[in-house]
Amino acid sequence: VLVDAPCSGLGSPRRRPGARWRRTAKDVNELAELQRELLTSALATVRPGGVVAYTTCSPHVLETEYVVRDVTRRLDRRGQRVEVLHAGNAATRLAPRPPAGAERRMLQLWPHLEGTDAMFCALLRRVD
């Protein structure tokens, strides 16, 4: 299941140069809450053993790593196990050259390093 979450767009300045001036802290917080809801719903929908790819075009930790952390902690407290797979390893196998930060479980691409938007990807497997 792919969750290509609506985000602030802060990671795509080439395509949306004004995004950083139009977004407020409140916008980012509201988007992060929506992102947590979407990721939680996707993990509830996928069968045990299934994988959810959570992606955004934002480099903001409130929309990326914190969303994954918050959702996995919340589900863990409910007794639902989710494993964060190694997205960096997956990207290394698929890309013509390893992206910067490929050693990390959650992958953050940067425009100045990869020539892409600031894309984020986390792969989560529902354990039970």
Language-model segment annotations:
Residues D4-S41, R47, A53, S58-E63:
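Mobile active-site "lid"/loop adjacent to the S-adenosyl-L-methionine
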Residues L2, P6, P48-D128:
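C-terminal catalytic and target-recognition region of SAM-dependent MTase-like enzymes
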